[in-house]
């Protein structure tokens, strides 16, 4: 089993993104993230910084989207992919099974 999903597998399915600096200040939004930018994502990233530092990857899920957080060059980038109800054809993130 993979220890994480490579960013190259997430990007083709991404429908939005949020980018934060090292102080968790929002720098950029795109796609569906423009609607959800006021969500507690920055707080979630702050609380899970240890996991991001250890693995370089973390997953957040809500009713509609899966947020894939990556730490890159001092920034935190969250790519959102649609939640696939039956998850067929989707590689599940670490810790999430069908």
Swiss-Prot record:
Q: What subcellular locations does the record give? A: Cytoplasm
Keywords noted in UniProt: Cytoplasm
Question: What high-level taxonomic lineage is stated for the organism?
Answer: Eukaryota, Fungi, Dikarya, Ascomycota, Saccharomycotina
Chief location bin: cytoplasm
GO CC annotations on file:
cytoplasm; cytosol
Superkingdom of this protein's organism: Eukaryota
Cytoplasm in keyword set: yes
The protein in question is named Uncharacterized protein YNR034W-A
């Amino acid at each position: 089993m993979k220890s994480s999903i490579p960013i190259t597998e997430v990007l083709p399915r991404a429908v939005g993104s949020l980018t934060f600096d090292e102080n968790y200040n929002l720098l950029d939004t795109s796609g569906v993230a423009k609607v959800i930018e006021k969500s507690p994502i920055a707080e979630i990233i702050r609380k899970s910084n240890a996991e991001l530092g250890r693995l370089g990857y973390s997953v957040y899920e809500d009713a509609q989207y899966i947020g894939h957080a990556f730490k890159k060059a001092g920034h935190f980038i969250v790519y959102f992919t649609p939640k696939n109800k039956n998850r067929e054809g989707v590689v599940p993130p670490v810790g999430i099974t069908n």
